[in-house]
């Protein structure tokens, strides 16, 4: 479980977040939406211990962060990028574990390629493989699909959903795309303009997600409700 309690953040004279409280159950997929500058990414970085806060965050020890720009090392191959964190942790069987992770995200056969040779969607798959290879208890995702075209984005949403249902990690996604949030999440957290506060938490009433659900009237009703 992840517990966010009374999280407040100032950057000099600017208040980014005000008294944010949020409990996220183990294995839950949560998305955070809201206007630009409302503190969504700041909240994610606070949960990751990348930014300090006046409040408290309780979470499992083993987590991963997927950045918007994929944060790949250009001088390392696809295989080398996936093996990096395992090298830092002294993990055994790096090669075989990396191969499994790459197969899970559809990048088997590209082990010896370099990041500059990959499409935007492939780079994001690689970033996800690098995060999943250590079997984290939770994953924080900061707009990871924002740089790809819409068709690729929908395919990656489906793949991310499959990874989550398979590996049972807790996920927190920051996104500007409300349909994406509804497709992936158990609940969608809606934040106010700065200083960011939670104004609504919407339960998503769908058990399973398939591409066809995007055309469902109820799906679009939920999207429109969150959009206001």
Q: Where are each of the predicted segments found?
A:
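Hydrophobic anchor residue at the start of the ABC signature
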Residues: 128
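Conserved ABC ATPase "signature" region
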Residues: 92-110, 162
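Conserved signature/switch motifs of ABC ATPase nucleotide-binding domains
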Residues: 113-116, 134
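Short helical segment in ABC ATPase nucleotide-binding domains corresponding to the A-loop/adjacent helical element
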Residues: 79-87, 95, 203
């Amino acid at each position: 479980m992840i517990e966010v309690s009374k999280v407040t953040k100032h950057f000099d004279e600017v208040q980014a977040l005000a008294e944010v409280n949020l409990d996220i159950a183990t294995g839950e997929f949560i998305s955070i939406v809201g206007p630009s500058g409302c503190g969504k990414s700041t909240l994610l970085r606070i949960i990751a211990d990348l930014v300090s806060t006046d409040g408290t965050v309780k979470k499992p020890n083993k987590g991963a962060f997927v950045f918007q720009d994929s944060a790949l090392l250009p001088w390392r191959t696809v295989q080398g990028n996936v093996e990096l964190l395992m090298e830092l942790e002294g993990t055994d069987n790096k090669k075989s574990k990396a191969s499994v992770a790459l197969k899970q995200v559809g990048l088997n056969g590209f082990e010896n390629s370099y990041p500059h040779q990959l499409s935007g969607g492939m780079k994001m798959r690689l970033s996800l493989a690098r995060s999943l290879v250590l079997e984290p208890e939770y994953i924080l995702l900061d707009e990871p699909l924002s740089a790809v075209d819409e068709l690729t984005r929908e395919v990656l949403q489906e793949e991310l959903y499959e990874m989550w249902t398979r590996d049972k990690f807790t996920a927190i996604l920051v996104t500007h795309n409300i349909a994406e949030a509804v497709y992936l999440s158990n609940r969608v957290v809606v934040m106010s303009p700065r200083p960011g506060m939670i104004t609504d938490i919407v339960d998503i009433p769908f058990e399973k997600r398939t591409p066809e659900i995007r055309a469902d009237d109820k799906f679009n009703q939920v999207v429109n409700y969150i959009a206001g």
